[in-house]
């Protein structure tokens, strides 16, 4: 039976796609392997915390004792290998979650050291902007170590991180809008080891946006104290309507919660308004959805490369 060409693709394009897919078979196999591992990890966490439909019901008002919300935060902590988690619809995006984490961990007079060059534009406004409420306006300092040929400059990081006033070392896992390679957890672990050697009390913070479930490990499992991201990206599985997360040391997550709500309230309040089910379902699907997104990007890059375009990453 002749198959219908619903999209009106030319025979050349269809053949290019087949050739690209055949070439990418070993890459797709590795992506599937990671997705299978992470799906098992998520399922094991669901079983350990006895997830049931009773956790899907939301709360209104203050949101005290929201069982579904509190359990989901425990699951996130387990998945990332941390002491605590903060998973909230109140985070409007990843930048908001990162901002709460930064302001929670840093005080006036402290210095944040970014070792992956400057953060992306929206977060940079939070850190160095002249707008009211920025870290700069609160007297929190900022320095950076630029990447060397697109990779971490461990020698420069060791020197800069040793300064007494550096209270946080910040890494951006994703390339963001820069032309560089994404950091692997292995590379993040190497940087963490360098920082620990010269400044053991510094908080190591990772912007994990777009990085969740792309490897078997997460940054907090290789030495980072805390990481944050958005639920409308990987961990939401395409189902979470909004929100963000922070995972890490209990004291750091608690301080971030105080920034999200108010000192003395922290994570005790925060109604979920019937959205818990989507957050759970999205997290369950997240490893698979993330894998499909990576496959699509790899496939598109290969087809464009076959057509003569320069692609990055290649």
Predicted regions and their residues:
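Conserved glycine-rich beta-strand-loop-beta hairpin in the small C-terminal domain of fold type I
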Residues: 314
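Solvent-exposed, charged/polar functional surfaces in cytosolic regulatory/catalytic domains
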Residues: 75
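Conserved PLP-enzyme active-site core in the AAT-like
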Residues: 2-25, 32-33, 41-47, 52-55, ...
């Amino acid at each position: 039976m002749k198959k219908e060409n619903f999209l009106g693709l030319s025979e050349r394009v269809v053949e290019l796609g087949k050739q690209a897919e055949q070439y990418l078979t070993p890459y797709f196999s590795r992506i599937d392997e990671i997705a299978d591992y992470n799906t098992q990890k998520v399922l094991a966490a669901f079983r350990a915390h006895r997830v049931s439909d009773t956790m899907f019901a939301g709360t209104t008002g203050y949101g005290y004792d929201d069982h579904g919300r509190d359990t989901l935060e425990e699951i996130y902590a387990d998945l990332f290998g941390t002491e605590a988690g903060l998973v909230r619809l109140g985070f409007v995006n990843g930048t908001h979650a990162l901002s709460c984490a930064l302001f929670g961990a840093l005080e006036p007079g402290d210095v944040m050291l970014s070792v992956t060059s400057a953060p992306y534009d929206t977060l940079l406004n939070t850190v160095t902007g002249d707008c009211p409420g920025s870290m700069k306006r609160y007297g929190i300092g900022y320095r950076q170590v630029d990447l060397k040929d697109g990779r971490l400059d461990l020698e420069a990081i060791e020197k800069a991180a040793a300064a007494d006033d550096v209270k946080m070392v910040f890494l951006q896992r994703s390339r963001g809008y820069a032309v560089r390679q994404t950091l692997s957890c292995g590379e993040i672990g190497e940087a963490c080891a360098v920082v620990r050697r010269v400044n053991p009390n510094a908080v190591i913070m990772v912007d994990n946006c777009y990085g969740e479930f792309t490897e078997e490990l997460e940054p907090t499992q290789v030495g980072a104290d805390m990481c944050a991201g958005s639920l409308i990206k990987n961990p939401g599985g395409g189902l979470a309507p909004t929100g963000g997360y922070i995972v890490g040391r209990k004291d750091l997550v608690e301080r971030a919660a105080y920034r999200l709500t108010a000192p003395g309230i922290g994570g005790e309040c925060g109604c979920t308004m019937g959205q818990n089910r989507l957050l759970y379902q999205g997290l369950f699907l997240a490893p698979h959805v993330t894998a499909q997104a990576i496959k699509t990007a790899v496939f598109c890059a290969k087809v464009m490369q076959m057509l003569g375009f320069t692609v990055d990453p290649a």
